[in-house]
């Protein structure tokens, strides 16, 4: 063995002791690799790297459960995989639509700040070494000069540190603005905001995706760029500086480099083996946050009904249940982070520090440029100060490099969390795009078979079971349905093959029992529901106006309520003035609210200020303002008095508006010319309306109902009299015979 060391030392010009130390390092490294590799290999193959089970965290509640028939697809859990990089590249096209953008400018400034901070760190490390050298050499003048330099360099260093954080926040805000703008454009295009909730079931909480998910994704991307770019640059530059310094002093950097590579590799393997599925956990946490917010908003939207029913206990239990599910998920993430961070800190703080001391000591001890065995006291003292300077500089550089590697490895957890946010944001844009193109899918939950613990969400593409084969054609005059069925988003056929035509000047009365498809027909005519079969000829949307039973009151002034959804500029472009709006309010008997509420510019919460009848008359005022060719009236005057209601309908007919009305009031029949009647079993009939005959039949129906209403009471009294008298009655005998048969 000694002969081998001597031969090796002679060949590479090493001393015998240096060759022995290098051989010892290589043997130790080989032994550590031989010992750790099988352990890590077994650890990676253990079932500990399983997918999260159902008992790990309870599944989030679904907003709706639909029947699943044939085609079912499973969503993969978000993680660091090919899907993540594909989704990130697709989102990059939104973040950077072209080369020269605001986001590119902030990114370049951020990169310059990160690079500047790296060079400042290297300069400060060298300056620290020179300060320590001046202390060892007892040179106060040199020490003061170096200290002043150190304080002066602190000014740009602190500015760069602050600028890095500032630019990171600006970059995150720019990303968020870009994503929000694109999301809003897509969300409000082609009535996607309606269809994504009522026609599609993949996004349970679009508000969560549009707000918090986009915010978290933007912050995570910007922070991760900062946490990866600077550390990678730090590792490259500090490694180059350390190797150059060691080589200039006559020391070999091979041993420390191999040791560093081995330690980093082993640490990465251990952390990867111990890392929980943060991407899946964070995505589930975001889902539960969104559902909790949805439950809160649901209570706010129905607060009056809940108060009337005194249902606060039920709603409180529902809220507590949702919050406990969220708290359970957050506690699960915290507990997994606790052990992961403990292992991470032990490896990166203590194991790396010990290895760092070895890596710094070996080049200094073995460097020929620091040998002082045969020197006098003066030169020996100089060598001591040089070694001190080199040790201080190398230690600072190594600490900077170790911190950079630590941040790179710690970023794995952040990357997995980013994968969760990326999956949710990408899925939101994907769903918006498909819904915009008329592709609808319903999310369903399949109960696990044989007590299976699978949590996978299942989806049924509705477009595969109900292909949209119908055609919608915009025409200038008339509404024509040719074999158009009424099919709900859940796939239920309410009415099949509607065939009718409404010309201008015709007024159609639509009747039928509840749930027969009256309002559903209006949704098809308005373009909210697709036409699955047949051909629908209808005017463009601007020539049709829908008025529901409960009109929507927007945020804004009284003027904004009348002209909704137009803006004030749109009103002026159409040639309207406030005096014209006053005439409209006179037509619907609503002008008194102008003085009562403080004029046209008064801003209030109009859904609470106006009564039910006033809100319905406001809806009719909007119809007179927009002057459509066709008005779709869905019980829109049920809270208005009959006399005022008749005047409004007469004014609408006088304005040349064709009415398609859903109403149960016989007093309005005289304002219609045709009848579309649904029977509630899928059948329908379309005919000309004879108001006189229909009113006569209605009066006869009401008379018979009133006469027959007393028969059960009379029959009961007859039975009582027969029992008291002990006699039978002919009617009682007939009834008994019927019951027996």
Swiss-Prot record:
Highest taxon of the lineage: Eukaryota
Any Gene Ontology CC annotation: peroxisome
GO biological process terms, semicolon-separated: alpha-linolenic acid metabolic process; fatty acid beta-oxidation; fatty acid derivative biosynthetic process; linoleic acid metabolic process; long-chain fatty acid biosynthetic process; long-chain fatty acid import into peroxisome; myelin maintenance; negative regulation of cytokine production involved in inflammatory response
Positions of glycan attachment: 190, 227
PROSITE patterns linked to this entry: ABC_TM1F, ABC_TRANSPORTER_1, ABC_TRANSPORTER_2
Keywords per UniProt: ATP-binding, Glycoprotein, Hydrolase, Membrane, Nucleotide-binding, Peroxisome, Translocase, Transmembrane, Transmembrane helix, Transport
Region called Interaction with PEX19, residue ranges: 1-218
Predominant location category: membrane
Organs and tissues of expression: Expressed in brain and testis.
InterPro entries attached to this UniProt entry: AAA+_ATPase, ABC1_TM_dom, ABC1_TM_sf, ABC_transporter-like_ATP-bd, ABC_transporter-like_CS, ABC_transporter_sub-D, P-loop_NTPase
Localisation per UniProt entry: Peroxisome membrane
Catalytic activity field: a very long-chain fatty acyl-CoA + H2O = a very long-chain fatty acid + CoA + H(+); a very long-chain fatty acid(in) + ATP + H2O = a very long-chain fatty acid(out) + ADP + phosphate + H(+)
Membrane topology: Multi-pass membrane protein
Keyword Isomerase: no
Single Gene Ontology MF annotation: amide transmembrane transporter activity
Boundaries of every ABC transmembrane type-1 domain copy: 107-399
Binding locations of ATP: 512-519
Domain ABC transporter: 479-705
Function comment: ATP-dependent transporter of the ATP-binding cassette (ABC) family involved in the transport of very long chain fatty acid (VLCFA)-CoA from the cytosol to the peroxisome lumen. Like ABCD1 seems to have fatty acyl-CoA thioesterase (ACOT) and ATPase activities, according to this model, VLCFA-CoA as free VLCFA is transpoted in an ATP-dependent manner into peroxisomes after the hydrolysis of VLCFA-CoA mediated by the ACOT activity of ABCD2.
Self-association and partners: Homodimers. Homotetramers. The minimal functional unit is a homodimer but the major oligomeric form in peroxisomal membrane is a homotetramer. Forms heterotetramers with ABCD1. Forms heterodimers with ABCD1. Forms heterodimers with ABCD3. In addition to tetramers, some larger molecular assemblies are also found but represented only a minor fraction. Interacts with PEX19; facilitates ABCD2 insertion into the peroxisome membrane.
Family of the protein in this entry: Belongs to the ABC transporter superfamily. ABCD family. Peroxisomal fatty acyl CoA transporter (TC 3.A.1.203) subfamily.
Protein's name according to its UniProt entry: ATP-binding cassette sub-family D member 2
Species per Swiss-Prot/TrEMBL record: Rattus norvegicus (Rat)
